[in-house]
Amino acid sequence: MTPQERRSSASLALIFALRMLGLFLVLPVFALEARKYPGGDDAALVGMAMGIYGLTQGILQIPFGVASDKFGRKPVMVVGLLIFAVGSAIAAWAPTLHWLVAGRALQGAGAISAAVTALLADQTRDVVRTKAMALVGASIGLMFALSLVLSPFLASFIGLHGLFAMTSALAVGGIAVVIWWVPPEPEKHVDQARGGVLSVLRHPALLRLDFGVFVLHAVQLSMWVALPAMLVQAGLARDQHWQVYLPAVLASFFVMGATLFPLEKKGYLRAVFLFAIALIALVQLALWALAHTVAGVWPMALVLFVFFCGFNVLEASQPSLASRVAPAASRGAALGVYNTLQSLGFFAGGAVGGWLVKSAGAQALFLASTLAMLAWLGVAWGMDAPAPKTGLKAG
């Protein structure tokens, strides 16, 4: 990477990190802490509170992405982070679960993911973009690992209200990074092609990735509706869950580094991509089996490690592929569609996951997740290997 590419990658990764740390801090304790609110014993409503963030973010990802093509990436990022900070403040104040849903919905309205990834794509060459996207993915993963350690500890002192207040402060910090550290945008942007969104929606290779990111994040979020309770049943107190999460996340980073980058250079990215999808399908099947009994801590830890191995590979490679195949003139729109499906996946995972657990139990949730991953594997199977420095063709 050039110095400019390193600065761009590091600063944009930090923005993602600050924003995602706030989101991740509440995730491990949300389902348990939400029970303290009026109506908190309703698993479907708790799932809605977890997932509504993804619905509003999904609705606004495309408008924010198109706006970043027209008005510039950095102004859109500042506006989005400001909205996110206000939503976090409302969630911190929320006296009821319904107000918490409202705050989470406003959090999601700060839909900057497309603008951030588009700016990163603008400022990096194709040949190093997977590394740049992986740096962003690694920063998100590290924030997740950090939140697993801090979340139960902080929640015991400041509760869910305090965690949301911290989230608001972190978003303000992200605004400072955008203004003072992110490199200036290119002075001249390619004008967005007329009908760019429609052309993106007709792009077969992008549609495969859009479907995949929806399934991946629906499955990821739905897991957290059931996993904390399963770990408690396994004999691990809530404030000890990080002892399972943290080693699994950190070890999976080493696996990603040892597999994704070397195999991509050798032309095996398609094989690694498909293997990672199959791996997560097997994880969901294993969780379905474990949900039929009181699982031990070690089997749960092993399953989570395998999950994060597959998840990290997909989280690093998918946005890189999307940015590489997207037309340059409508890159913001293309990544807006991609991030819309990602956000809708979050919403579906929370809402449908909560409903399934409430109506049919964790077994039904993990069975549905297994089938969803197998469907994605079938869709992704037809993709061609990405061409060097360009992307992948539609199969």
Locate predicted features.
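Juxtamembrane intracellular "pre-TM" segments in multi-pass secondary transporters
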Residues: 1-6, 182-212
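Residue-level signature of mid-helix packing/kink "hotspots" within the transmembrane helices
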Residues: 54-62, 144-145, 249-257, 346-347
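Conserved MFS/SLC helix-loop-helix module at the cytosolic interface between two early adjacent transmembrane helices
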Residues: 59-95
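Helix-to-loop junctions at the C-terminal end of transmembrane segments
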Residues: 60-72, 254-269, 357
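Cytoplasmic membrane-interface "Motif A"-like loop-to-helix N-cap segments
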Residues: 70-80, 265-278
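Cytoplasmic helix-loop-helix junction between adjacent transmembrane helices
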Residues: 103-141
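C-terminal membrane-cytosol helix-exit motif in multi-pass small-molecule transporters
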Residues: 168-187, 379-384
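C-terminal transmembrane helical hairpin of 12-TM major facilitator-type secondary transporters
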Residues: 270-318
